């Protein structure tokens, strides 16, 4: 019996690619660059399974295909806002993701950005590399204290709770949360957290706000000029969720005009292109989407995607089916 044909749209860690070849007839994207819509349409007609990433835009145009061969999109990553789910369903394509395995590493990056933005680490490094440091002095590059402050978390799933754990138990922070669903008293009690009914209210009562909600149309520009104007003085905003969650023009304006103190971004709207107005903000720390970028996590993500794909072709329901 022939193996199902699997197309992997970006290069995976070697160990995972080798494991994939044992179970599937694998085609790799050797150029390791994002696919065009035409490339994706051709792939949907050619392969039994495709493993896309956040860099692959699977919008309705990409799904405008006849004689589809693809039966499953085993997404490499937990977020799947780059996949138009209704279009996939219309073509009878199963969609899976890779939750759980990247929660800790993404939470670590959120805390990294929080500390860097608060303590002006990016500015300090740039000063040193430019040979502009003139020595220690009491008023040099004063930042914000993290320990004991109030941390607001928007989106309280696995990653949001991992950040709460680090903030509360590691830095003695008070935890505020916003979630569209009611969080159980047991989970709130674990972090001594308070749930807020609106983003605006949370922004006004937090020193730091970290975003951990899904992307997609429902959360596009969830952080915008209107609610940033209601933020507590000195707020520091962190985004490791999805770029579209933040109105980047509004963020740049808030940074320039001291509406908020600083920000840290690991994700961007339209990445890998970065909005030029963000580049000009000295009080903004930026990383190139490194949330899950550890050897262990990237391998676990690949193995999880493969497990979903194997289950599907065995006739079982994949454990991480989202559509």
Predicted feature descriptions by range:
Residues 159:
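Hydrophobic/small residue at the entry helix of a nucleotide-binding pocket
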Residues 58-62, 182-277:
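Rossmann-like adenosine-cofactor binding region
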Residues 169-188:
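NAD(P)-binding Rossmann-fold cofactor-contacting core
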Residues 95, 234-323:
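Rossmann-like dinucleotide-binding domain for NAD(H)/NADP(H)
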């Amino acid at each position: 019996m022939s193996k199902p044909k699997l197309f992997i749209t970006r290069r995976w860690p070697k160990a995972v690619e080798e494991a994939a070849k044992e179970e599937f007839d694998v085609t790799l994207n050797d150029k390791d660059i994002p696919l065009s819509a035409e490339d994706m349409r051709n792939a949907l007609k050619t392969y039994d399974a495709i493993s896309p990433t956040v860099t692959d835009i699977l919008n309705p145009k990409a799904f405008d295909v006849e004689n589809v061969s693809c039966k499953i999109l085993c997404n490499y990553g937990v977020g799947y806002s780059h996949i138009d789910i209704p279009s996939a369903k219309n073509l009878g394509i199963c969609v899976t993701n890779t939750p759980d395995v990247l929660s800790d590493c993404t939470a670590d990056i959120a805390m990294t950005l929080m500390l860097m933005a608060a303590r002006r680490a990016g500015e300090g490094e740039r000063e040193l590399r430019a040979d502009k440091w003139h020595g220690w002095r009491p008023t040099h590059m004063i930042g914000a204290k993290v320990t004991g402050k109030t941390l607001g978390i928007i989106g309280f799933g696995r990653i949001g709770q991992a950040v709460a754990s680090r903030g509360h138990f590691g830095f003695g922070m008070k935890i505020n949360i916003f979630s569209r669903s009611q969080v159980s008293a047991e989970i709130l009690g674990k972090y001594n957290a308070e749930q807020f009914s609106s983003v605006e209210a949370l922004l006004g009562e937090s020193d730091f706000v970290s975003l951990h909600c899904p992307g997609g149309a429902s959360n596009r520009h969830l952080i915008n000029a209107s609610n940033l104007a209601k933020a507590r003085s000195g707020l520091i905003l962190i985004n490791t969720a999805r770029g579209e969650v933040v109105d980047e023009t509004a963020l740049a304006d808030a940074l320039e005009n001291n509406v908020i103190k600083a920000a840290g971004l690991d994700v961007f709207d339209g990445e890998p292109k970065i909005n030029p107005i963000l580049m000009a903000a000295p009080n903004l720390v930026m990383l190139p989407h490194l949330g899950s970028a550890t050897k262990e996590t990237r391998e676990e993500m690949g193995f999880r995607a493969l497990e979903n794909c194997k289950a599907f072709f065995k006739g079982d329901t994949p454990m991480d089916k989202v559509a």
